[in-house]
Amino acid sequence: MGINFDVSRPKARSSINMTTKFHTIGLIGKPHHPGTNQTLKRLHHWLTVQGYEVLVEERVASELGTNIVAVDLLEIGARCDLAIVVGGDGNMLGAARVLARFDVGVIGVNRGNLGFLTDLPPDAFEEALAKVLDGEFDTEHRFLLEAEVYRHGMLKASNTAVNEAVLHPGKIAHMIEFEVYIDNQFMYSQRADGMIVSTPTGSTAYALSAGGAILTPNLQALILVPMFPHTLSCRPIVVDACSTIKMVVSPENGENLEVSCDGHVHLAVLPGDEIIVRRSSEQLRLIHPKGHNYFHVLRSKLGWGSKLF
């Protein structure tokens, strides 16, 4: 599925330690956001002074002033060793769906709310980022989902998701009917507001709000979470990450249905369509500061209790 680019990387400047893992760095952020722009300007200046080649996503480049090398996300993925995303998890998800097809590390500076995927603080990123650039970091691979919509056996639409693919009606509080198959084995029929198919990464997002379990990031699994099911005994279920999930929409449904990928990309669904959700071949390569602790992140973001003794 990946797009191949034959783009040679420019040589690193002599002021950079040649043992470093990173030479060309991409900056990505939320457009027209004052806090994000401020952090991006600081990052650009800080990295440029140290001799790194810095590429800036074109959507935010015009807000950073002159002498900026503006490129699109695809070129950042093709040319950069590291991409720094400034914003919230939503900005990280949008960038990740593109960057996952390239061998580029991704780290985040949190300018959002919870920030499960954005490790660095916006007001004091320099110390932690300097250590990362010196090679002191942990790498974590997060797999993506691929969602496909078939109509009369023909592929009509597809996209990828980092967090989840959600089958739902276009109308609020509108129940739909569908069947669910796991690896072509019938599991159940469902009358509900929809179905969430989530990765471990997405298990702390929409799936958690709908009553799903939290899956640790290294778990090779998917979780299916029904949204307000009409059958109260229908609970979330965890399946192997290599499973193929098929949802068949009843012909009796209305026409205003869709599959949402991370809440950003929407695929139109008609009655009788089949939705296939499976693990994608693409992976997001997340970079964390050395000593990153997932359970510390959960405690701080979800307000869990600290140690008693």
From Swiss-Prot:
Named cofactor requirement(s): a divalent metal cation
Places the protein is found: Cytoplasm
Active site (UniProt): D89 (proton acceptor)
Pfam families the record matches: NAD_kinase, NAD_kinase_C
EC number: 2.7.1.23
This protein's GO CC annotations: cytoplasm
Keywords: ATP-binding, Cytoplasm, Kinase, NAD, NADP, Nucleotide-binding, Transferase
Gene Ontology molecular functions: ATP binding; metal ion binding; NAD binding; NAD+ kinase activity
Swiss-Prot/TrEMBL GO biological process terms: NAD metabolic process; NADP biosynthetic process
Residue sites binding NAD(+) per the record: D89, G90, N163, E164, H174, R191, D193, T204, A205, Y206, A207, L208, S209
Keyword Secreted: no
Catalytic activity: NAD(+) + ATP = ADP + NADP(+) + H(+)
HAMAP family the record matches: NAD_kinase
Family named by the database record: Belongs to the NAD kinase family.
Biological function: Involved in the regulation of the intracellular balance of NAD and NADP, and is a key enzyme in the biosynthesis of NADP. Catalyzes specifically the phosphorylation on 2'-hydroxyl of the adenosine moiety of NAD to yield NADP.
Protein known as: NAD kinase
Encoding gene (name): nadK
